[in-house]
Amino acid sequence: MMRHVLLFVFLLPLVAVAQKNKYGLNPTKLEAYKASVKENPAKELVDLEKLIPGLVLDIRYATTNNFTGERIYTLAKAYARRPVAEALKQAQVALKEKGLGIKVFDAYRPYKATVKFYEVYHDTTYVASPYKGSRHNRGCAIDMTLIDLKTGQELTMPTGYDSFQKAAWPSTPVKDPEVRKNRALIIEVMKQQGFKVNSSEWWHFDFIGWTKYDVLDIDFEELP
């Protein structure tokens, strides 16, 4: 009996390694995710459109209007972990007082999409490495811009969404005072709610504490 136990203990790590993909990761699937949420409700992926009144979605990866030129998602949905979603809701409340609102381009991103992006564009300055997984894969990142609530129009920012130009970097100087003000506003409002802007994308905000969450590979169709 002891011999069998020792053999099992020896083989267990080998089984775990075998389950990893070619990038060395074993992203969490639906059943394991459900178990983790039961243990810790903060890990729940929340439907942002249902939680946040007035939130506008423009999920580019559910269309061909993105840097891949392909439709990556089959549904135009936006999810985030519970604390991330609640923080974004507070940002929406703060912006509403200024006559502004949030338009979301992307939020939780299944790991398989990150693999696709990497295969299309290998520069990890702009796309996440599948060897590590992304903040989006953890449900802890939001791609967004600001809109005028009266007109529904986006505020002018330094570049469009998903630009690979240096002009998209938050540190790049901006000559136009209106654009400079808009960029500073979105960064400050999100900072107040616990988000940090990505160093190469003015639209990308990571939630502080994202390291506590695992990489997920769950399709939108599997989520409520």
Where do the model's predicted regions map?
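Bacterial Sec-dependent N-terminal signal peptides
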Residues: M1-K22
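Extracytoplasmic cell-surface/polysaccharide-interacting catalytic and binding patches
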Residues: A18-F105, V120, T124-S200, G209-P224
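Segments that shape or occlude catalytic/ligand-binding pockets
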Residues: P110
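Short active-site loop/helix that positions an aromatic residue
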Residues: F117
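Aromatic-lined carbohydrate-binding/catalytic grooves of carbohydrate-active enzymes
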Residues: T114
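Conserved metal-phosphate-binding beta-hairpin within the catalytic cores
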Residues: F205
